[in-house]
Amino acid sequence: MIDSKTKLIGLIGHPVEHSFSPIMHNAAIKDLGINYTYLAFDVSEENLKYIVSGAKALQIAGFNVTIPHKINIMKYLDEIDEDAKSIGAVNTVKIENGKTIGYNTDGIGVKRALEEKSGILINKNILIIGSGGASRAVSFELAKENNLTIVNRNIEKAKILSEELSTKLKKENSIKYGALNIDIKNFDIIINTTPVGMYPDTDVNPVIPLNDIKKSAVVMDLIYNPLEPVFLKEAMKYGVETINGLGMLVYQGAVSFQIWTGKKPDVYVMKKAINSKIR
């Protein structure tokens, strides 16, 4: 029940009306019995600069940041976590004692979703499709203990990201780059970090041939609308394990939730809430 002591957390982005974040976070709040509520706010680019001062004035506990504000929000924050600085994007803001602190939980969200299916990720050969904002967070996290190859339509962008990560993580030989027609037979994990295949353009497929994929490989797509994007449907034809973006959404959200509240949410409760909405 909302009262004068209820703490507000939320999501800012544009658009946000189809977001599952309020559903899963409010389910976790109810499950833990804590006095919080989570709302989604559609914020245009021109109004972004007012969000931080407004959130401070209203004593909001914190908020998630989604497309298109993950990079631009950084210039308005008081502090930025070291990993988020290295990634160059923020998806979580905590407000404490009048100070805003930015974090990025996207990479750890993907890692935990993968480990749920594949076990501990160490020394795996991972192929990352895309070199945009999502790719930066995922690549930064997974490159810490694995071997990465980043591919992109624009090979120069893949090269720039791989070199940047190699420098930041001091891993010169384990982060490579290549073209979309790369030989995939030696990869343990393949991850699409691009929006290719996302609603409403659900018939479009990242141009990665999977015919040489090994049977033990895992294919992940960060898209969760639709739940079975065309890239995963293609992977299923080869009998490999597939993971959609729902797990990443839940796990990155769970880390954000703990940053704001100090409480560890039940990810099963969060997943169940989303699944009941989808079905």
Curated annotation (Swiss-Prot):
Keyword Lyase included in the entry's annotation: no
Function: Involved in the biosynthesis of the chorismate, which leads to the biosynthesis of aromatic amino acids. Catalyzes the reversible NADPH linked reduction of 3-dehydroshikimate (DHSA) to yield shikimate (SA).
Family under the similarity heading: Belongs to the shikimate dehydrogenase family.
Active-site feature positions: K70 (proton acceptor)
NCBIfam families named among the record's database cross-references: aroE, PRK00258.2-2, PRK00258.3-3
Keyword Amino-acid biosynthesis in record: yes
One Pfam family linked to the record: Shikimate_DH
Alphabetical list of SUPFAM superfamilies matching this protein: Aminoacid dehydrogenase-like, N-terminal domain (SSF53223), NAD(P)-binding Rossmann-fold domains (SSF51735)
Single GO molecular function: NADP binding
Organism of provenance: Methanococcus maripaludis (strain C6 / ATCC BAA-1332)
Pathway recorded for this protein: Metabolic intermediate biosynthesis; chorismate biosynthesis; chorismate from D-erythrose 4-phosphate and phosphoenolpyruvate: step 4/7
Protein name, entry field: Shikimate dehydrogenase (NADP(+))
Subunit structure: Homodimer.
